[in-house]
């Protein structure tokens, strides 16, 4: 995930630092490499058997287990397919660095969703995945249908987030915990 985060933040900065506009295939290749490296790391974890619970802020909100790893690989493959499928499309567009950066940042959220063991972390990860996709939906700023789609997607996402928060609050009220394992028992 650190690879995706560093590259995702670096792509627009590299674009700004370069004097001439970089080609979309350059930024796409960097994003592709970061995604391949992330899949390689997850597979390396499986091969070493170093799958152990991860803790953030001394709370078990992420579990680095085989189930999460399998879905993390699936999500990263989806991000790779999106990146590869965007090469030709982005040749005609400006700011391809931002486009590929948003794909990587969304992939981070997808991987966090896969490893999440807490409802609050699941919600935060879902939002981390969703917010870049709202921007991607409205990427074609001058196209009215793109703007309309982004607005509708954002409003639908905001309503969905409110419903999810309401459901999490009910689950917490009934069980006294937001841990998924404790909530389902």
What are the language-model segments listed below?
Residues 1-185:
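Alpha-helical transmembrane segments of multi-pass membrane proteins predominantly involved
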């Amino acid at each position: 995930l650190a690879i995706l985060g560093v590259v995702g933040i670096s792509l627009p900065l590299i674009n700004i630092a370069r004097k001439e506009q970089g080609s979309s295939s350059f930024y796409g290749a960097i994003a592709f490499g970061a995604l391949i490296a992330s899949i390689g790391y997850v597979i390396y974890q499986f091969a070493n058997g170093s799958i152990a619970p991860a803790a953030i802020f001394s709370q078990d909100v992420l579990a680095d287990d085989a189930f999460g790893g399998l879905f993390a690989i699936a999500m990263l493959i989806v991000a790779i397919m999106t990146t590869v499928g965007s090469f030709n499309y982005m040749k005609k567009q400006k700011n391809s660095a931002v486009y590929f950066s948003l794909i990587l940042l969304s992939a981070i959220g997808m991987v966090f969703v896969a490893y999440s063991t807490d409802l609050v972390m699941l919600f935060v990860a879902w939002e981390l995945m969703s917010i870049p996709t709202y921007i991607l939906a409205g990427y074609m700023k001058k196209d009215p249908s793109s703007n309309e789609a982004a607005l509708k997607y954002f409003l639908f996402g905001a309503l969905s987030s409110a419903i999810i928060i309401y459901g999490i609050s009910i689950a917490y009220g009934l069980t006294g915990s937001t841990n998924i394992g404790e909530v389902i028992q």
